[in-house]
Amino acid sequence: NGFIGKNGMGKTNVLDAIYYLSFCKGTMSASDAFNLRHNTEFFMIQGEYESDGMGATEVVCSLKRGTRKRVKCDGKDYKRISEHVGKIPLVMLSPADSQLVTGGSEERRRFMDMVISQYDAAYLNAAIRYERTLKQRNALLKAEEEPDRGVMDVLEEMMGADAEVVFNARRNFVEEFSPIFQRLYSRLCPDSREQVTIKYDSHGFRGALQPQLASWRERERLVGYSLHGVHKDELVLELNGYPV
């Protein structure tokens, strides 16, 4: 299927809506608030998916200003929105994908998150918990008063446990994806002698995260944020052994 139309007619908006119904968030807006039209109180996106052997599935995402976002599948509300991710697998291709090569490491982490979260619910839940705990720890690191050691110990223990889940899933993904990437590159550039590789760089290769957080706590208070963890992971792209 294809969408044909003049500029500004909403072709990209249709694609973004389809993406939203799969991931419960858009590709272009950092916040759901930007999806609300000016002087309106709510928005709703509704779609019906059909697949071989599964029949039709109706998905509805809605948000009323000042309230929690709601997601329904075949008329049933999800208790947690993350439960829906992966039910309707989807891959989004756009000109912005060039950022996977030219952009910062957060773009490549986002790519891994998008793929892995669609088939590994434990990964998605661990990643969400990790980001939430990371924000709490960073807030304490920025505080003028010295943070409570007991609270920091608990947060670092939680981060360590979730980081292990995230690290293992990302490492396994890169190991499986790397030969696929190399094979597709060879098909696109059959006459090229260039060797392309993807490598995963993570704190996980240096051991458990919790001891690292504890040992760096005082130094991280000086900068006001966490210097170690899977939020610093990198997907390194190499051409003939050199970073792209």
Regions found by a protein language model. Give the residues of each.
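Conserved NTPase motor "head" modules and their coupling/switch loops across ABC/AAA+ ATPases, GTPases
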Residues: 1-6, 19-20, 146-244
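Conserved lysine of the Walker
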Residues: 11
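Regular, well-ordered alpha-helical segments
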Residues: 20-23, 139
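Nucleotide-state sensing region of NTPase/ATPase domains
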Residues: 22-107, 113-123, 178-183, 196, ...
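Long, non-coiled-coil amphipathic alpha-helical linker/lever segments
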Residues: 31-32, 112, 119-170
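Alpha-helix boundary/capping detector
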Residues: 40-47, 138, 142, 239
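Short phosphate-engaging motifs
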Residues: 107-108, 122, 173, 205
